[in-house]
């Protein structure tokens, strides 16, 4: 991984802020973000060589429930992770994972933005036991290897009896539980699939004395 630069984004929209999930198209230009207040943001990154210098064609709107109904309750709006499942961010399908009212939805995305979900993944009963602040924090679709096309979702800090992180993988629609070893008390905050079938997991830890650490 190489640091290319950063941007400070501002908007007068009341829906702007609290961005908790981000996905880029394969060319690294089109992006989609989702927020913990139930909004989506799309746009195109502008580069100077390899360094991002701005955003254009930005659009913002609310995530919706089935049949394009509004998400009225706060606990229904807390989107924490997003990934591209099919196509592109201009014409494709995305998966959005929510905390609070734990669920993972399939949404269509086009040049007009994000429509309401077509369906939700069937979750294992155990996932309903996650507390509101320890639910899904990462979702991705594996791009290669034996489980190419499988959906993987990881919880922030829902742990088993041995203290390991809990997640699930959907292979041909069938759920399987998996665990990640907890090393150093870090929480899971995002994940991204690699072309070879691997997965990069981003973790963070906060302490009043040490501040925020990420790896």
Where are these regions (language model features)?
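Sequence/structural signature of beta-propeller domains
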Residues: 1-215
